[in-house]
């Protein structure tokens, strides 16, 4: 991997997601702002919206932004209007405790949330009702999450130093990367829809590029 371009932002960024063919959205949680950046030949700031929370994780589907602070997911339009939020379970308990990253299913019906304290949580994108939860001793402090083109879910464990694969029903299907592979404190991951390769990013270190086999 090599640096193709860089853009200095007005404050510290946290997360990024694709919102168009040549456009991404970046969260700046410490100024409650989402910036939209063109990524054509060079990166350029297009516009920004203010949100009513410390915006950490972000995902996009069909003109909607799923933005989270530590314990709530807020759904905004691309124009910056808040439409709904997910904070509580039907039981009255809090849905989330420490949200680190999110992603949306290919059909837009499910939001997958990586929660450092609670594990993987899947909720309905319309009403926030829990579809499934996944946590076990094989993964600790879930930080990163992504999907492949087959609908498989991949989560990385910060302190378990690994990556697990989960199916769309919330069932464990395997360990993609183990702590024996010298993966130290993974924070984020993504999969290229074109090459099928996984990019893993570790705390205070360079990224890793892995070829996945199906």
List PLM regions with ranges.
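Short loop/turn segments that connect beta-strands within beta-propeller blades
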Residues: 1, 38-42, 77-81, 125-127, ...
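Beta-rich, blade/repeat-based domains predominating
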Residues: 10-24, 51-65, 91-110, 114-118, ...
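Conserved beta-strand positions in repeat-built beta-propeller and related beta-rich domains
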Residues: 18-19, 25-32, 67-71, 105, ...
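Asp-box/WD-like beta-propeller blade repeats and closely related beta-sheet repeat scaffolds
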Residues: 32-64, 71
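Structural signal for beta-propeller blades
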Residues: 32-35, 73-75, 119-121, 161-164, ...
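Structured C-terminal portions of repeat-based eukaryotic scaffold domains
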Residues: 118-185
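Blade-level signature of beta-propeller repeat domains, shared across WD40, Kelch, NHL, RCC1
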Residues: 184-214
